[in-house]
Amino acid sequence: MMYHIPDVLSADQVAEFTRQLAQAEWVDGRVTVGNQGAAVKQNQQIDTRTPLYARLQAAVLDALRGHPQFFSAALPRTISAPLFNRYGPGETYGFHVDGAVRQNAEAGWMRTDLSATLFLCDPESYEGGELVIEDTYGQHRVKLPAGHLVLYPASSLHCVTPVTHGVRQASFLWIQSMVRDDKQRATLYDLDRTIQSLKARFGDGEEVLSLLNMYHNLLRQWTEV
């Protein structure tokens, strides 16, 4: 399943990110991928050895950890250190699949259940640069407002189409979920959204508490911690 998570960053936060990204040191994006990815990757990434990178990735992690919809959809056990990329005119990233495991400074090796892209530019500010994700239903072209995030299975083939005008900037990261199975995780997400909607309309009635009990029993059955 693919999810659009709105307003991970506020407009003020996006403006601050834009200001700081203008001061960043950028390096060839191929330094973070293997041979398969390097053959189709043409972009730039922020140098992860700089103090600016440390501040930006910490800000993204704080925003994600405080976003209820992201937590409900991802059920994160481990979140990788966010990276930041930039695509200028002519730059692109051809179809590829993300590696199944990654090294993480805090957790050692982590399994990549989910991939996420947090858009940092308004879609009107650049042309091209769509994130294209393939699944069993076909191709999905994603180009979200600044501060919004797309979350999708890391097993999906995906690409970034060539930017033809302007600059596309984003943060990207991976999540190891407490619930490994995509269908089980989607069931829990749908159930949680239903519970939250019913609570907003009717309060904590008997039926809502029954669904909440069901949610936690399923989570207890399916989770890996």
From Swiss-Prot:
One of its GO terms (molecular function) is L-ascorbic acid binding. PANTHER family: PKHD-TYPE HYDROXYLASE YBIX (PTHR41536:SF1). InterPro entries: Oxoglu/Fe-dep_dioxygenase_dom (IPR005123), PKHD_C (IPR041097), PKHD_hydroxylase (IPR023550), Pro_4_hyd_alph (IPR006620), Pro_4_hyd_alph_FE2OG_OXY (IPR044862). 2-oxoglutarate binds at R168. Pfam families: 2OG-FeII_Oxy_3, PKHD_C. SMART domains: P4Hc. Fe cation binds at H96, D98, H158. One of its GO terms (biological process) is intracellular iron ion homeostasis. Its cofactor is Fe(2+); L-ascorbate. Residues 78-177 form the Fe2OG dioxygenase domain. This is PKHD-type hydroxylase KPK_3192. It comes from Klebsiella pneumoniae (strain 342). Binds 1 Fe(2+) ion per subunit. Its EC number is 1.14.11.-. Keywords: Dioxygenase, Iron, Metal-binding, Oxidoreductase, Vitamin C.
